[in-house]
């Protein structure tokens, strides 16, 4: 009898060419499917994820699922997978899921975080885990700008021009930045995110924090629907897929408002 297994995994994206399998490159999906292939005595097991992450991007709460005929408890799955996965991937949680659960299509919202180190001196021990932006920033102006992203908008100005997705309307439930000493942490919760959307928003809001732009520019950019008018794409290493929400929309709202 086949069962569907849901896992929450974390990974350090530094030495991966992204999540999705690519020929000749090291990827998170490739490493995970290789472990499952060994556990299934050479049979390929396909893994589905909540979404793809690019090279250098990290995850604390990526969600995946796969179907298997093996009869193991959740704890046995967790131990067996972690015993064979490389050190830069860890399975944090395992449970048997309903047959109609899908890591991507059942998701109601996602949370991304982005970390920025703002000290004058670069921290060599953090260089793979946050962007470095050694400039004086006005946090209140940045949060004023981020609040303008709340609600449902066309985010064309904040997605890569390379995207092939035509529907670029998304709902942003939460967008804010907090400072803990020289470390900034942006938090975004939304119904979905376009390619490079978080990184372009961060790059634009950092310019607002420096005084190069006004917070009101966010509304202008949303209306313009033109990627060329927004700020630069922030580096990959500061980005984390933090959590995927599968609860109903009302619960998502209560979670992000709390």
UniProtKB/Swiss-Prot annotation:
Short name of one Pfam family: PseudoU_synth_1
Alphabetically ordered keywords of this record: Isomerase, tRNA processing
PANTHER family membership: PSEUDOURIDYLATE SYNTHASE, TRNA PSEUDOURIDINE SYNTHASE-LIKE 1
Native species: Geobacillus kaustophilus (strain HTA426)
Residues annotated as signal peptide: none
Catalytic reactions of this protein: uridine(38/39/40) in tRNA = pseudouridine(38/39/40) in tRNA
EC number: 5.4.99.12
Role according to the record: Formation of pseudouridine at positions 38, 39 and 40 in the anticodon stem and loop of transfer RNAs.
Enzyme's top EC category: isomerase
Alphabetical list of SUPFAM superfamilies matching this protein: Pseudouridine synthase
CDD domains: PseudoU_synth_EcTruA (cd02570)
Family note: Belongs to the tRNA pseudouridine synthase TruA family.
Record protein name field: tRNA pseudouridine synthase A
Subunit details: Homodimer.
Alphabetical list of InterPro entries matching this protein: PsdUridine_synth_cat_dom_sf, PsdUridine_synth_TruA, PsdUridine_synth_TruA_a/b_dom, PsdUridine_synth_TruA_C, TruA/RsuA/RluB/E/F_N
Keyword Calcium appears in the UniProt entry: no
Active site residues according to the UniProt entry: 54
One GO biological process term: tRNA pseudouridine synthesis
GO MF annotations in UniProt: RNA binding; tRNA pseudouridine(38-40) synthase activity
UniProt keyword Cell cycle, yes or no: no
């Amino acid at each position: 009898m086949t069962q569907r297994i849901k896992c929450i995994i974390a990974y350090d994206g530094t030495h991966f060419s992204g999540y999705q399998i690519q020929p000749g490159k090291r990827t998170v999906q490739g490493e995970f499917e290789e472990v499952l292939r060994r556990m299934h005595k050479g049979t390929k097991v396909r893994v589905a994820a909540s979404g793809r992450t690019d090279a250098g991007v990290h995850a604390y709460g990526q969600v995946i699922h796969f179907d298997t005929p093996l009869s193991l408890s959740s704890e046995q799955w967790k131990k067996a997978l972690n015993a064979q996965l490389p050190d830069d991937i860890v399975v944090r949680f395992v449970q048997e899921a309903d047959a109609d659960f899908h890591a991507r299509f059942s998701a109601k919202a996602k949370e991304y975080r982005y970390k920025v180190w703002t000290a004058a001196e670069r921290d060599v021990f953090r260089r793979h885990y946050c962007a470095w932006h050694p400039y004086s920033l006005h946090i209140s102006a940045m949060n004023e700008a981020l609040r303008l992203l709340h609600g449902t908008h066309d985010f064309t100005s904040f997605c890569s021009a390379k995207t092939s997705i035509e529907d670029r309307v998304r709902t942003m439930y939460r967008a804010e930045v907090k400072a803990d000493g020289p470390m900034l942490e942006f938090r975004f919760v939304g119904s979905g995110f376009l390619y490079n959307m978080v990184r372009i928003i961060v790059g634009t809001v950092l310019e607002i924090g420096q005084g190069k732009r006004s917070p009101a520019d966010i509304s202008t950019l949303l209306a313009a629907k033109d990627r060329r008018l927004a700020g630069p794409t922030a580096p990959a290493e500061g980005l984390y897929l933090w959590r995927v929400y599968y609860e109903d929309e009302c619960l998502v709202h209560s979670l992000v408002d709390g």
